[in-house]
Amino acid sequence: MTSASSATIQPPRIPRVGFVSLGCPKATVDSERILTCLRAEGYLISPSYADADLVVVNTCGFIDSAVAESLETIGEALTENGKVIVTGCLGAKEDVIRQAHPSVLAVTGPQATEEVMQAIHRHLPKPHDPYLDLVPPQGIKLTPKHYAYLKISEGCNHRCTFCIIPSMRGDLVSRPVGNVLQEAQNLVDAGVRELLIISQDTSAYGVDIKYRTGFWQGRPIRSRITELARALGELGIWIRLHYVYPYPHVDELIPLMAEGKLLPYLDIPFQHGSKRILKLMKRPANSENVLARIRQWRDICPDIALRSTFIVGFPGETEQEFEELLAFLEEAQLDRVGAFAYSPVKGAAANALPDPVPSEIQQERLARLMQWQEEISKKRLAGKKGRILKVLVDTVDENGVIARSYADAPEIDGVVYIEPDFSIKPGDWVDVRITRTGIHDLWAKKI
Protein backbone atom coordinates (compact mmCIF):
# COMPACT_ATOMS: atom_id res chain seq x y z
CA MET A 1 0.00 0.00 0.00
CA THR A 2 1.36 3.39 -0.94
CA SER A 3 1.26 6.11 1.70
CA ALA A 4 -0.32 9.47 0.92
CA SER A 5 3.02 11.20 1.37
CA SER A 6 4.73 9.02 -1.23
CA ALA A 7 1.88 8.86 -3.76
CA THR A 8 2.64 10.31 -7.17
CA ILE A 9 0.53 13.36 -7.91
CA GLN A 10 -0.50 13.35 -11.55
CA PRO A 11 -0.32 16.80 -13.16
CA PRO A 12 -3.60 18.04 -14.60
CA ARG A 13 -4.19 17.25 -18.26
CA ILE A 14 -3.28 20.19 -20.45
CA PRO A 15 -6.27 21.05 -22.67
CA ARG A 16 -5.78 20.19 -26.32
CA VAL A 17 -7.32 21.92 -29.32
CA GLY A 18 -7.56 20.41 -32.78
CA PHE A 19 -7.36 22.84 -35.69
CA VAL A 20 -8.38 22.63 -39.35
CA SER A 21 -7.52 25.57 -41.62
CA LEU A 22 -9.20 25.88 -45.02
CA GLY A 23 -9.13 28.55 -47.71
CA CYS A 24 -6.69 31.15 -48.95
CA PRO A 25 -3.43 32.50 -47.47
CA LYS A 26 -5.40 35.27 -45.74
CA ALA A 27 -7.32 32.59 -43.84
CA THR A 28 -4.00 30.88 -43.07
CA VAL A 29 -2.81 34.06 -41.35
CA ASP A 30 -6.04 34.19 -39.32
CA SER A 31 -5.39 30.58 -38.27
CA GLU A 32 -1.81 31.41 -37.29
CA ARG A 33 -3.02 34.23 -35.05
CA ILE A 34 -5.49 31.95 -33.26
CA LEU A 35 -2.86 29.23 -32.84
CA THR A 36 -0.41 31.78 -31.45
CA CYS A 37 -2.99 32.87 -28.85
CA LEU A 38 -3.71 29.24 -27.94
CA ARG A 39 -0.04 28.46 -27.34
CA ALA A 40 0.46 31.72 -25.42
CA GLU A 41 -2.33 30.65 -23.05
CA GLY A 42 -0.83 27.20 -22.57
CA TYR A 43 -3.12 25.08 -24.75
CA LEU A 44 -1.61 22.22 -26.71
CA ILE A 45 -2.41 21.78 -30.40
CA SER A 46 -3.59 18.28 -31.25
CA PRO A 47 -2.76 16.75 -34.64
CA SER A 48 -5.77 14.41 -34.45
CA TYR A 49 -9.47 14.64 -33.74
CA ALA A 50 -9.30 11.77 -31.24
CA ASP A 51 -6.80 13.43 -28.91
CA ALA A 52 -8.41 16.89 -29.01
CA ASP A 53 -10.79 18.22 -26.37
CA LEU A 54 -12.46 20.33 -29.04
CA VAL A 55 -11.81 21.29 -32.66
CA VAL A 56 -11.71 24.69 -34.38
CA VAL A 57 -12.52 24.75 -38.10
CA ASN A 58 -11.48 27.88 -40.02
CA THR A 59 -13.74 27.88 -43.07
CA CYS A 60 -13.84 29.33 -46.58
CA GLY A 61 -17.01 30.61 -48.21
CA PHE A 62 -15.83 32.33 -51.39
CA ILE A 63 -17.37 29.97 -53.96
CA ASP A 64 -19.85 27.10 -53.78
CA SER A 65 -17.19 24.38 -53.84
CA ALA A 66 -15.44 26.04 -50.89
CA VAL A 67 -18.73 26.19 -48.96
CA ALA A 68 -19.30 22.49 -49.64
CA GLU A 69 -15.77 21.59 -48.48
CA SER A 70 -16.19 23.66 -45.31
CA LEU A 71 -19.53 22.06 -44.42
CA GLU A 72 -18.10 18.60 -45.09
CA THR A 73 -15.10 19.32 -42.86
CA ILE A 74 -17.33 20.59 -40.03
CA GLY A 75 -19.38 17.40 -40.31
CA GLU A 76 -16.24 15.25 -40.21
CA ALA A 77 -14.98 17.08 -37.10
CA LEU A 78 -18.36 16.61 -35.38
CA THR A 79 -18.38 12.91 -36.22
CA GLU A 80 -14.80 12.31 -35.10
CA ASN A 81 -14.75 14.62 -32.07
CA GLY A 82 -18.19 16.05 -31.32
CA LYS A 83 -17.12 19.47 -30.03
CA VAL A 84 -16.58 22.00 -32.81
CA ILE A 85 -16.15 25.77 -33.00
CA VAL A 86 -16.49 27.31 -36.47
CA THR A 87 -14.79 30.49 -37.66
CA GLY A 88 -13.76 32.06 -40.97
CA CYS A 89 -15.55 33.44 -44.01
CA LEU A 90 -18.38 30.91 -44.01
CA GLY A 91 -18.91 31.78 -40.36
CA ALA A 92 -20.36 35.09 -41.56
CA LYS A 93 -23.33 32.97 -42.69
CA GLU A 94 -24.16 31.39 -39.35
CA ASP A 95 -27.61 30.31 -40.54
CA VAL A 96 -26.05 28.16 -43.28
CA ILE A 97 -23.78 26.43 -40.76
CA ARG A 98 -26.49 25.98 -38.11
CA GLN A 99 -28.90 24.55 -40.66
CA ALA A 100 -26.38 21.93 -41.76
CA HIS A 101 -24.78 21.34 -38.34
CA PRO A 102 -26.96 22.59 -35.46
CA SER A 103 -24.73 21.01 -32.81
CA VAL A 104 -21.64 23.19 -33.34
CA LEU A 105 -20.60 24.94 -30.13
CA ALA A 106 -20.08 28.42 -31.57
CA VAL A 107 -19.80 30.28 -34.88
CA THR A 108 -17.77 33.42 -35.59
CA GLY A 109 -16.89 35.30 -38.76
CA PRO A 110 -13.42 35.89 -40.23
CA GLN A 111 -10.56 37.75 -38.49
CA ALA A 112 -12.30 37.09 -35.16
CA THR A 113 -9.43 35.91 -32.98
CA GLU A 114 -10.86 37.36 -29.75
CA GLU A 115 -14.31 35.85 -30.35
CA VAL A 116 -12.79 32.44 -31.12
CA MET A 117 -10.70 32.56 -27.95
CA GLN A 118 -13.76 33.55 -25.89
CA ALA A 119 -15.67 30.58 -27.30
CA ILE A 120 -12.77 28.25 -26.51
CA HIS A 121 -12.59 29.62 -22.95
CA ARG A 122 -16.31 28.92 -22.46
CA HIS A 123 -16.10 25.32 -23.58
CA LEU A 124 -12.49 24.48 -22.64
CA PRO A 125 -11.11 26.67 -19.83
CA LYS A 126 -7.51 27.70 -20.30
CA PRO A 127 -4.69 26.22 -18.18
CA HIS A 128 -3.85 28.01 -14.95
CA ASP A 129 -0.14 28.33 -15.74
CA PRO A 130 0.46 29.24 -19.37
CA TYR A 131 4.01 29.20 -20.65
CA LEU A 132 4.58 32.34 -22.66
CA ASP A 133 8.07 31.19 -23.60
CA LEU A 134 6.47 28.49 -25.75
CA VAL A 135 5.54 31.20 -28.25
CA PRO A 136 8.38 32.54 -30.43
CA PRO A 137 8.42 36.27 -31.29
CA GLN A 138 7.22 35.55 -34.82
CA GLY A 139 4.19 33.62 -33.53
CA ILE A 140 2.98 30.17 -34.60
CA LYS A 141 3.21 29.57 -38.35
CA LEU A 142 1.55 26.94 -40.56
CA THR A 143 4.05 27.45 -43.38
CA PRO A 144 7.58 25.98 -43.64
CA LYS A 145 10.20 27.87 -41.63
CA HIS A 146 11.72 29.60 -44.66
CA TYR A 147 8.65 31.46 -45.93
CA ALA A 148 5.64 33.15 -44.36
CA TYR A 149 2.56 35.14 -45.25
CA LEU A 150 2.42 38.72 -43.98
CA LYS A 151 -1.08 40.22 -43.97
CA ILE A 152 -1.02 44.01 -44.11
CA SER A 153 -4.75 44.78 -44.06
CA GLU A 154 -8.22 43.30 -43.77
CA GLY A 155 -11.31 43.86 -45.88
CA CYS A 156 -11.90 45.64 -49.18
CA ASN A 157 -13.58 48.88 -50.30
CA HIS A 158 -14.44 47.59 -53.77
CA ARG A 159 -17.82 46.13 -54.65
CA CYS A 160 -17.01 43.83 -57.55
CA THR A 161 -20.30 42.26 -58.58
CA PHE A 162 -18.97 38.68 -58.55
CA CYS A 163 -17.48 38.93 -55.04
CA ILE A 164 -18.97 38.62 -51.55
CA ILE A 165 -15.74 39.13 -49.62
CA PRO A 166 -16.67 42.65 -48.35
CA SER A 167 -19.88 41.25 -46.86
CA MET A 168 -17.81 38.69 -44.95
CA ARG A 169 -14.62 40.60 -44.12
CA GLY A 170 -15.85 44.20 -44.19
CA ASP A 171 -14.27 47.36 -45.56
CA LEU A 172 -10.53 48.03 -45.72
CA VAL A 173 -8.73 48.20 -42.37
CA SER A 174 -4.97 48.74 -42.71
CA ARG A 175 -2.54 47.62 -40.02
CA PRO A 176 -0.18 50.24 -38.53
CA VAL A 177 2.95 50.34 -40.65
CA GLY A 178 5.22 49.96 -37.62
CA ASN A 179 3.41 46.78 -36.57
CA VAL A 180 3.70 45.32 -40.06
CA LEU A 181 7.42 46.03 -40.26
CA GLN A 182 8.10 44.71 -36.77
CA GLU A 183 6.33 41.45 -37.59
CA ALA A 184 8.38 41.25 -40.77
CA GLN A 185 11.60 41.79 -38.79
CA ASN A 186 10.59 39.10 -36.27
CA LEU A 187 10.02 36.64 -39.11
CA VAL A 188 13.37 37.44 -40.69
CA ASP A 189 15.09 37.01 -37.31
CA ALA A 190 13.44 33.57 -37.07
CA GLY A 191 14.96 32.46 -40.39
CA VAL A 192 12.25 33.37 -42.89
CA ARG A 193 13.73 34.04 -46.33
CA GLU A 194 10.59 34.91 -48.25
CA LEU A 195 7.65 37.08 -47.21
CA LEU A 196 4.45 36.86 -49.22
CA ILE A 197 2.57 40.12 -48.77
CA ILE A 198 -1.18 39.53 -48.75
CA SER A 199 -4.52 41.22 -48.09
CA GLN A 200 -7.81 41.53 -49.94
CA ASP A 201 -6.44 44.60 -51.75
CA THR A 202 -2.70 45.00 -51.19
CA SER A 203 -2.26 48.13 -53.31
CA ALA A 204 -4.96 49.97 -51.31
CA TYR A 205 -2.89 49.72 -48.13
CA GLY A 206 -3.25 52.90 -46.06
CA VAL A 207 -6.21 54.41 -47.95
CA ASP A 208 -8.51 54.05 -44.93
CA ILE A 209 -6.06 55.83 -42.62
CA LYS A 210 -5.18 58.49 -45.21
CA TYR A 211 -1.62 57.18 -45.56
CA ARG A 212 -0.87 58.24 -42.01
CA THR A 213 2.82 58.34 -41.07
CA GLY A 214 3.98 55.70 -38.62
CA PHE A 215 7.37 54.86 -37.14
CA TRP A 216 9.70 51.90 -37.29
CA GLN A 217 13.14 51.78 -35.72
CA GLY A 218 12.85 55.49 -34.98
CA ARG A 219 12.19 56.70 -38.51
CA PRO A 220 8.95 57.92 -40.10
CA ILE A 221 7.31 55.76 -42.80
CA ARG A 222 4.03 56.51 -44.57
CA SER A 223 1.32 53.87 -44.46
CA ARG A 224 1.33 53.49 -48.24
CA ILE A 225 2.19 50.42 -50.30
CA THR A 226 5.17 51.98 -52.10
CA GLU A 227 6.79 53.19 -48.88
CA LEU A 228 5.98 49.94 -47.09
CA ALA A 229 7.42 47.89 -49.95
CA ARG A 230 10.59 49.99 -49.97
CA ALA A 231 11.09 49.41 -46.22
CA LEU A 232 10.40 45.68 -46.56
CA GLY A 233 12.95 45.59 -49.37
CA GLU A 234 15.65 46.59 -46.88
CA LEU A 235 15.29 43.32 -44.94
CA GLY A 236 17.52 41.39 -47.34
CA ILE A 237 15.05 38.62 -48.19
CA TRP A 238 12.56 37.86 -50.96
CA ILE A 239 9.46 40.10 -50.85
CA ARG A 240 6.59 38.87 -53.05
CA LEU A 241 3.42 40.91 -53.64
CA HIS A 242 0.00 39.27 -53.99
CA TYR A 243 -3.56 40.50 -54.63
CA VAL A 244 -2.47 43.80 -56.18
CA TYR A 245 -5.43 45.74 -57.59
CA PRO A 246 -4.33 47.61 -60.75
CA TYR A 247 -4.38 51.17 -59.39
CA PRO A 248 -2.18 53.69 -61.28
CA HIS A 249 0.26 53.97 -58.35
CA VAL A 250 1.17 50.29 -58.76
CA ASP A 251 3.51 51.59 -61.48
CA GLU A 252 5.69 52.98 -58.66
CA LEU A 253 6.50 49.44 -57.50
CA ILE A 254 8.14 48.32 -60.73
CA PRO A 255 11.38 50.34 -60.26
CA LEU A 256 11.75 48.71 -56.82
CA MET A 257 11.65 45.35 -58.59
CA ALA A 258 14.21 46.48 -61.13
CA GLU A 259 16.47 47.59 -58.25
CA GLY A 260 16.18 44.17 -56.56
CA LYS A 261 14.30 45.44 -53.49
CA LEU A 262 11.21 43.40 -54.39
CA LEU A 263 10.92 40.16 -56.32
CA PRO A 264 10.05 40.96 -59.95
CA TYR A 265 6.68 39.27 -59.52
CA LEU A 266 3.21 40.78 -59.54
CA ASP A 267 -0.01 38.93 -58.73
CA ILE A 268 -2.61 41.27 -60.22
CA PRO A 269 -6.19 40.09 -60.96
CA PHE A 270 -7.36 41.51 -64.30
CA GLN A 271 -10.49 39.24 -64.39
CA HIS A 272 -11.39 39.78 -68.09
CA GLY A 273 -10.41 41.42 -71.37
CA SER A 274 -13.77 42.75 -72.53
CA LYS A 275 -14.68 46.34 -71.63
CA ARG A 276 -18.38 45.54 -71.31
CA ILE A 277 -17.85 42.51 -69.09
CA LEU A 278 -15.37 44.42 -66.91
CA LYS A 279 -17.94 47.18 -66.45
CA LEU A 280 -20.55 44.58 -65.45
CA MET A 281 -18.01 43.26 -62.95
CA LYS A 282 -17.33 46.81 -61.71
CA ARG A 283 -13.65 46.37 -62.52
CA PRO A 284 -11.24 48.76 -64.33
CA ALA A 285 -12.39 48.50 -67.95
CA ASN A 286 -9.59 50.01 -70.06
CA SER A 287 -7.81 46.90 -71.34
CA GLU A 288 -5.76 48.94 -73.84
CA ASN A 289 -4.35 50.97 -70.96
CA VAL A 290 -3.58 47.77 -69.05
CA LEU A 291 -1.66 46.38 -72.02
CA ALA A 292 0.29 49.63 -72.37
CA ARG A 293 1.19 49.49 -68.68
CA ILE A 294 2.37 45.89 -69.00
CA ARG A 295 4.67 46.93 -71.85
CA GLN A 296 5.97 49.79 -69.71
CA TRP A 297 6.57 47.47 -66.75
CA ARG A 298 8.60 45.13 -68.95
CA ASP A 299 10.61 48.03 -70.33
CA ILE A 300 11.58 48.99 -66.76
CA CYS A 301 11.96 45.43 -65.41
CA PRO A 302 12.38 42.92 -68.26
CA ASP A 303 12.35 39.89 -65.93
CA ILE A 304 9.04 40.72 -64.28
CA ALA A 305 6.74 37.69 -63.89
CA LEU A 306 3.04 38.49 -64.10
CA ARG A 307 0.32 36.30 -62.60
CA SER A 308 -3.37 37.01 -63.00
CA THR A 309 -6.79 35.44 -62.55
CA PHE A 310 -9.78 35.49 -64.88
CA ILE A 311 -13.46 34.60 -64.79
CA VAL A 312 -15.08 32.94 -67.80
CA GLY A 313 -18.79 32.53 -68.40
CA PHE A 314 -19.74 35.69 -66.52
CA PRO A 315 -23.46 36.52 -66.98
CA GLY A 316 -23.99 37.94 -70.45
CA GLU A 317 -20.56 36.95 -71.79
CA THR A 318 -20.85 36.36 -75.55
CA GLU A 319 -18.56 34.25 -77.69
CA GLN A 320 -17.09 37.43 -79.14
CA GLU A 321 -16.35 38.81 -75.66
CA PHE A 322 -14.73 35.54 -74.67
CA GLU A 323 -12.54 35.79 -77.77
CA GLU A 324 -11.63 39.33 -76.67
CA LEU A 325 -10.33 37.74 -73.46
CA LEU A 326 -8.22 35.28 -75.47
CA ALA A 327 -6.88 38.17 -77.54
CA PHE A 328 -6.00 40.03 -74.34
CA LEU A 329 -4.06 37.00 -73.09
CA GLU A 330 -2.22 36.74 -76.39
CA GLU A 331 -1.21 40.38 -76.25
CA ALA A 332 -0.38 40.44 -72.53
CA GLN A 333 1.78 37.27 -72.61
CA LEU A 334 1.27 36.65 -68.89
CA ASP A 335 3.52 34.14 -67.17
CA ARG A 336 0.97 32.55 -64.84
CA VAL A 337 -2.82 32.44 -65.12
CA GLY A 338 -5.54 31.02 -62.93
CA ALA A 339 -9.13 30.90 -64.16
CA PHE A 340 -12.51 29.64 -63.06
CA ALA A 341 -16.03 29.57 -64.39
CA TYR A 342 -18.41 32.10 -62.87
CA SER A 343 -20.32 30.60 -59.95
CA PRO A 344 -23.49 32.33 -58.69
CA VAL A 345 -22.45 32.60 -55.05
CA LYS A 346 -25.34 33.59 -52.81
CA GLY A 347 -25.24 37.33 -52.16
CA ALA A 348 -23.23 38.31 -55.26
CA ALA A 349 -24.74 41.25 -57.16
CA ALA A 350 -23.88 39.60 -60.49
CA ASN A 351 -26.50 36.93 -59.86
CA ALA A 352 -29.17 39.47 -60.84
CA LEU A 353 -27.60 40.13 -64.25
CA PRO A 354 -29.46 38.78 -67.29
CA ASP A 355 -28.35 36.08 -69.72
CA PRO A 356 -26.51 33.58 -67.52
CA VAL A 357 -24.09 31.43 -69.50
CA PRO A 358 -25.00 27.72 -69.49
CA SER A 359 -22.64 25.52 -67.49
CA GLU A 360 -21.55 23.43 -70.48
CA ILE A 361 -20.51 26.58 -72.37
CA GLN A 362 -18.69 27.89 -69.28
CA GLN A 363 -16.68 24.68 -68.99
CA GLU A 364 -15.90 24.62 -72.71
CA ARG A 365 -14.62 28.20 -72.57
CA LEU A 366 -12.61 27.50 -69.42
CA ALA A 367 -10.89 24.55 -71.11
CA ARG A 368 -10.14 26.66 -74.20
CA LEU A 369 -8.70 29.48 -72.11
CA MET A 370 -6.42 27.18 -70.13
CA GLN A 371 -5.22 25.45 -73.29
CA TRP A 372 -4.59 28.87 -74.88
CA GLN A 373 -2.65 30.07 -71.85
CA GLU A 374 -0.65 26.85 -71.58
CA GLU A 375 0.96 27.59 -74.94
CA ILE A 376 1.83 31.11 -73.78
CA SER A 377 3.26 29.89 -70.46
CA LYS A 378 5.21 27.12 -72.18
CA LYS A 379 6.76 29.58 -74.64
CA ARG A 380 7.72 32.03 -71.89
CA LEU A 381 9.33 29.29 -69.80
CA ALA A 382 11.22 27.98 -72.83
CA GLY A 383 13.03 31.31 -72.96
CA LYS A 384 14.63 30.51 -69.60
CA LYS A 385 16.54 27.45 -70.82
CA GLY A 386 20.25 27.92 -70.24
CA ARG A 387 19.74 30.83 -67.85
CA ILE A 388 21.22 30.95 -64.36
CA LEU A 389 18.58 31.58 -61.69
CA LYS A 390 18.63 31.96 -57.94
CA VAL A 391 16.11 29.58 -56.36
CA LEU A 392 14.78 29.02 -52.85
CA VAL A 393 14.69 25.38 -51.77
CA ASP A 394 11.42 24.00 -50.39
CA THR A 395 12.07 20.25 -49.99
CA VAL A 396 14.96 17.79 -50.23
CA ASP A 397 14.67 14.00 -50.36
CA GLU A 398 16.06 10.97 -52.19
CA ASN A 399 14.04 11.86 -55.30
CA GLY A 400 15.64 15.27 -55.62
CA VAL A 401 15.31 18.89 -54.65
CA ILE A 402 12.21 21.01 -55.21
CA ALA A 403 12.79 24.75 -55.28
CA ARG A 404 11.17 27.92 -56.58
CA SER A 405 12.46 30.84 -58.61
CA TYR A 406 11.40 34.48 -58.30
CA ALA A 407 8.55 33.64 -60.71
CA ASP A 408 7.08 30.87 -58.54
CA ALA A 409 4.86 31.57 -55.54
CA PRO A 410 4.31 28.54 -53.29
CA GLU A 411 1.36 26.25 -54.02
CA ILE A 412 -0.06 28.23 -56.97
CA ASP A 413 2.80 28.44 -59.48
CA GLY A 414 5.35 26.01 -60.86
CA VAL A 415 8.54 24.69 -59.27
CA VAL A 416 12.17 24.08 -60.18
CA TYR A 417 13.34 20.44 -59.99
CA ILE A 418 17.02 19.89 -59.12
CA GLU A 419 18.91 16.59 -59.09
CA PRO A 420 19.33 14.89 -55.65
CA ASP A 421 21.87 16.71 -53.50
CA PHE A 422 21.83 16.27 -49.72
CA SER A 423 24.25 19.16 -49.24
CA ILE A 424 21.26 21.38 -50.01
CA LYS A 425 18.78 22.12 -47.22
CA PRO A 426 15.24 23.55 -47.22
CA GLY A 427 15.49 27.32 -46.98
CA ASP A 428 18.78 27.51 -48.89
CA TRP A 429 19.21 29.89 -51.78
CA VAL A 430 20.96 28.07 -54.63
CA ASP A 431 22.19 29.21 -58.03
CA VAL A 432 21.13 26.81 -60.79
CA ARG A 433 21.30 26.55 -64.57
CA ILE A 434 18.02 25.72 -66.30
CA THR A 435 18.39 22.56 -68.41
CA ARG A 436 14.78 21.79 -69.38
CA THR A 437 11.44 23.58 -69.42
CA GLY A 438 7.80 22.51 -69.42
CA ILE A 439 4.36 24.10 -69.30
CA HIS A 440 4.57 25.09 -65.65
CA ASP A 441 7.87 23.79 -64.26
CA LEU A 442 11.62 24.00 -64.80
CA TRP A 443 14.45 21.48 -64.40
CA ALA A 444 17.93 22.60 -63.40
CA LYS A 445 21.43 21.69 -62.22
CA LYS A 446 23.21 23.30 -59.30
CA ILE A 447 26.23 25.36 -60.33
Swiss-Prot record:
Pfam families: Radical_SAM, TRAM_2, UPF0004. It is an enzyme of class 2 (transferase). [4Fe-4S] cluster 2 binds at residues 156, 160, 163. Its cofactor is [4Fe-4S] cluster. Residues 379-447 form the TRAM domain. Its EC number is 2.8.4.4. It catalyses: L-aspartate(89)-[ribosomal protein uS12]-hydrogen + (sulfur carrier)-SH + AH2 + 2 S-adenosyl-L-methionine = 3-methylsulfanyl-L-aspartate(89)-[ribosomal protein uS12]-hydrogen + (sulfur carrier)-H + 5'-deoxyadenosine + L-methionine + A + S-adenosyl-L-homocysteine + 2 H(+). Its main location: cytoplasm. Keywords: 4Fe-4S, Cytoplasm, Iron, Iron-sulfur, Metal-binding, S-adenosyl-L-methionine, Transferase. Gene3D superfamilies: Methylthiotransferase, N-terminal domain, Nucleic acid-binding proteins, tm_1862 like domain. This is Ribosomal protein uS12 methylthiotransferase RimO. It comes from Nitrosomonas europaea (strain ATCC 19718 / CIP 103999 / KCTC 2705 / NBRC 14298).
